[in-house]
Amino acid sequence: MADNLLSEQLLQRLQDGDNKGVDTLELAAVLSVDHQQVVGAVKSLQCLGEIIEAEQRSSKKWELSSEGEEIAQVGSHEARVFQSLPKEGLLQAELMKLPFAKVGFSKAMSNKWIRLDKAAAGGPCVYRVVETIEDTVKEKLQLILKGRADDVNEKDKNELKKRKLVNEVTVKSYWVTKGSGFSTSITKQETDLTPEMIASGSWREKQFKGYNFNALGVMPECGHLHPLLKVRTQFRQIFLEMGFTEMPTNNFIESSFWNFDALFQPQQHPARDQHDTFFLQDPALATEFPMEYLERVKKVHSEGGYGSQGYKYDWSIHEAQKNILRTHTTAVSARMLYKLAHQKEFTPVKYFSIDRVFRNETLDATHLAEFHQIEGVVADRGLTLGNLMGVLKEFFHKLGITKLRFKPAYNPYTEPSMEVFSYHEGLKKWVEVGNSGLFRPELLLPMGLPGDVNVLGWGLSLERPTMIRYGIKNIRELVGHKVNLQMVYDSPICRLDAC
């Protein structure tokens, strides 16, 4: 039905209504048209001036879900289960093959329409308990379908909603009344001023449709940032606000020396196994190392030193030479701390990095072989565990995380070490959000850092907060070839506001 015909019918009803108004929902029902078509006619009339007045109203309405519509036609699952049972009964295994039996069986049992005989010959068998039933679920759904939801009490409607058979929706409609310039005759308004109108002068006698400056225009084509990049930018901004300097993280390939040995991680540690680490085939080995530093690392591993007993094993340079895809960005931190140790005079520093790391892990909904690590490092004289907790509280507060707990943990290269937990309001439980600790003397002193210098460090992944922020449950929907590009186009700006 064309908009102009609907507009004429609306005006005629106002004319015949003795100054009473017209409800667009009622008009749509009377004319058997979609409500949005009537709304379109109202909008068109509003553009003509003061012909009508329209007041927007909101009301609640109950609608059937697709499953509810099916039940309104063929009956509830429990009724169909009852009707499927012959008088002599039916094996439960056969009954459960029916598509509606999974829900219908339990409902029919709770209604005491059927019973289950587990001791029957041939296996558990289901029998009727009553001769006839009344399918009240179907009856209530049919009432709602006919627009008589008020005839169904609230308890029953909530039960139907719990079963996902109905939904309560908010419906916006208009109450239309006559305007100051009301008329039943509609003069066509021009939408374009043409060269012919100007040449002939006919534009003087024509009425032009006014511009709607509130109308939404066509969105311009532009680039879009992936949610990971948006959250990464927000994290980076937080670090910069706290006075941190970003570390260069362009080396995806690291030697095992910088990735493991320099961090006082023993060569027999399970994390260095091929089941957890990607080893390079070509070039397989690194050849350039600061040899004096390498010898000090070898000694602290095999013999101990700096107040440590070490690990007491035969340290192998061949194992340290193996090239790998870095398993953490702490390898970058190790290089930066070594560089810091060789400055003429020690100066306190605050470093951070956000970049990719690689683990040979089993892929699932929350784990990938490639992901991002966020890391913060603070080096200064006299730092303590209390300083670490203070920095962490400030950092996570800027992320909007204020409820924190710290739990003792073990890391090869930090002591003491702490896992950081935050209370998740949605899950109603404490969840791990990061790991932290003070770098061990066995890591710092071989580098050449002064003995009174302590280094705080902590890290977390980028993917987990991004998934939480954007409500993504499967990491494959965030990263990889299955990413829905529309999600990238529509994702809002990331704001990690402090509470």
Curated annotation (Swiss-Prot):
Q: Which cofactor(s) does the record list? A: Mg(2+)
Q: Which reaction does this enzyme catalyse, per its entry?
A: tRNA(Phe) + L-phenylalanine + ATP = L-phenylalanyl-tRNA(Phe) + AMP + diphosphate + H(+)
Q: Where in the cell is it found?
A: Cytoplasm
Q: Does the keyword Transferase apply?
A: no
Gene Ontology CC annotations of this record:
cytoplasm; cytosol; phenylalanine-tRNA ligase complex
State any single GO MF term: phenylalanine-tRNA ligase activity
Quote the record's binding site residues for Mg(2+): E415
Task: Spell out the disulfide connections.
Answer: none
Provide an example Pfam family for this protein: PheRS_DBD3
Q: Where does L-phenylalanine bind?
A: T330, Q373, I374, E375, Y413, F439
- Keywords, comma-separated and alphabetical: Aminoacyl-tRNA synthetase, ATP-binding, Cytoplasm, Ligase, Magnesium, Metal-binding, Nucleotide-binding, Protein biosynthesis
SUPFAM superfamilies, per the entry: Class II aaRS and biotin synthetases (SSF55681)
EC numbers listed for it are 6.1.1.20
The signal peptide, as residue positions, is none
Q: Please provide the Gene Ontology terms (biological process) for this protein.
A: phenylalanyl-tRNA aminoacylation; protein heterotetramerization
**How does the record describe its quaternary structure?**
Heterotetramer; dimer of two heterodimers formed by alpha and beta subunits.
Q: Which family does it belong to?
A: Belongs to the class-II aminoacyl-tRNA synthetase family. Phe-tRNA synthetase alpha subunit type 2 subfamily.
| Name the UniProt record assigns to this protein | Phenylalanine--tRNA ligase alpha subunit B
Naturally occurring in which organism (per UniProt): Xenopus laevis
The organism's taxonomy opens as: Eukaryota, Metazoa, Chordata, Craniata, Vertebrata
